[in-house]
């Protein structure tokens, strides 16, 4: 497993991460540092979904979700909020793109507003990459 730290620019709700070649691998979100999210009245609207367009859409992950992160009601902070995975969920990327497109939105599909309000901002995140293993034959275990 390879861990890569990124400092990226969030434009609106989209992050683009350039890659040196098309990614035929598994990917997982390890941690993310984001500015304060403007809170809403209910808990549902204070969760964010982090999706990746290059993740394979499957029966159990049709929305290409990397992670859903609930923040609950939060108090204003001057600095970044940090979220770290206790368990890394790996998802298959099978794309000819030489980039990853990651989107951050509220679980209710509304735009996540950060404080202070500005169009572009820096985020820090760590992604885990693993090679896709060739499936073993069931005869290997006999």
Located regions from the model:
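Flexible assembly/topogenesis modules
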Residues: 1-142
């Amino acid at each position: 497993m390879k861990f890569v730290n990124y400092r990226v620019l969030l434009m609106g709700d989209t992050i683009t991460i350039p890659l040196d070649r098309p990614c035929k691998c598994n990917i997982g979100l390890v941690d993310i540092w984001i500015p304060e999210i403007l809170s809403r009245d209910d808990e549902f609207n204070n969760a964010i979904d982090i999706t990746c367009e290059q993740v394979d859409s499957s029966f159990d992950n049709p929305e290409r979700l990397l992670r859903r992160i609930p923040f609950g009601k939060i108090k204003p902070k001057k600095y970044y909020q940090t979220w770290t995975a206790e368990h890394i969920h790996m998802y298959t990327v099978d794309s000819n793109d030489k980039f990853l497109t990651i989107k951050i939105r509220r679980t209710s599909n509304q735009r996540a507003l950060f404080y202070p309000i500005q169009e572009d901002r820096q985020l820090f995140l760590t992604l885990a990459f693993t090679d896709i293993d060739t499936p073993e034959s069931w005869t290997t275990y006999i």
